[in-house]
UniProtKB/Swiss-Prot annotation:
Purpose: Plays an important role in the de novo pathway of purine nucleotide biosynthesis. Catalyzes the first committed step in the biosynthesis of AMP from IMP.
Keywords: Cytoplasm, GTP-binding, Ligase, Magnesium, Metal-binding, Nucleotide-binding, Purine biosynthesis
Pathway(s) it belongs to: Purine metabolism; AMP biosynthesis via de novo pathway; AMP from IMP: step 1/2
Binding-site residues for GTP, renumbered to this chain: 13-19, 41-43, 306, 332-334, 415-417
Gene source species: Proteus mirabilis (strain HI4320)
Pfam family, one: Adenylsucc_synt
GO biological process: 'de novo' AMP biosynthetic process; IMP metabolic process
Name of the featured protein: Adenylosuccinate synthetase
Recorded family membership: Belongs to the adenylosuccinate synthetase family.
GO cellular component: cytoplasm
Binding site for substrate: A300, T301, T302, G303, R304, S305, R306
Amino acid sequence: MSNNVVVLGTQWGDEGKGKIVDLLTERAKYVVRYQGGHNAGHTLVIDGEKTVLHLIPSGILRENVVSIIANGVVLSPEALMKEMTQLEERGIPVRSRLLLSEACPLILPYHIALDNAREKARGEKAIGTTGRGIGPAYEDKVARRGLRVGDLFDKKAFAQKLKEIIEYHNFQLVNYYKVEPVDYQKTLDDIMAIADILTGMVVDVSDLLYKATQKGELVMFEGAQGTLLDIDHGTYPYVTSSNTTAGGVATGSGLGPRYVGYVLGIIKAYSTRVGAGPFPTELFDETGDFLREKGQEFGATTGRSRRTGWLDIIAIRRAVQINSLSGFCMTKLDVLDGLKEVKVCVGYRLPNGEVIETTPLAADDWEGIEPIYESMPGWNESTFGVKDKAQLPQAALNYIKRVEELTGVPVDIVSTGPDRSETIILRHPFDA
């Protein structure tokens, strides 16, 4: 058993993972992204300065931490270079801190074109993707036709492979979706201009991480999105295209599951969701507006307004089961300050009157579900910026305790603000 830690979302993403990863990397040697792509949006606030990362791991701001983009991530060269440039302009030496797996599938312009064309064609049934080509890139990976970072080592062979795959996708874009084709030469020129930069950061990630664990060096795995968006276990088809759950760590990084010792589930004190899909506890009243405005619930990646609602314990329990959670970090507790009453969903009532305490698997099976709530007194005192559990209002402590009782998982960390210092650590994941 290793002391390595996984940090992942337990809801529909946007739980506040970036801040917690940044906070905990003080103890880590490596921080690894193992799934997703630049559809993630991890916001960090350090000494009042805000940083939003979409692709590069949140550990990049730490001087002695090595950040790794592993094989489970679909990599947009354009997005990576943009993010690297922004960080380097702030004096952060990204190229000496960042490593890539040669097995990362590349996101190229035809993936983005397909993503947007499909969403437009779906009309009202659109999934609500970020339009960044994530799904189509994973499709090419599974179909074994995708280009990977490692293909850039042989530029002549890459050019031929690119020509063939662009012809394949352009046929669909032009003849089915009736949109403009992707330009082969421009795509080739753009990727060749940065090919040496990408290949210069390539390492054997699986071997590196294995040797690191043998030396006792600590690794943190940074999840993107959330458990309920998992391609297999989420509200299908309103899901992302990767395994956002703890099982994705081994396949997405090449390090075996025995080398994970603690799984930290990030749980927002209420629920949010971006885009379409089931959301039983969604609020359409002034309380929902209150949570959205006070919580600044607007996507870091898309800027879209997030749907808001009460904490859904039934959905959280599913995340506990799937991920073997060791503990929770509860974020945005301060957003609930000032509410006279707070609620948590403890059951679902089906249209036929039956009450269930587990989440359905397919999105259609959520149709007509009504949440069953348990109410608790709210609190007027501010929890914002509190750094000591003893200073939290009793009603807030009761809320935390009730979540622990209903899920069977301890709340080991409480986040009371966006800055890394605004945190109460009750049990450190690396010491658990």
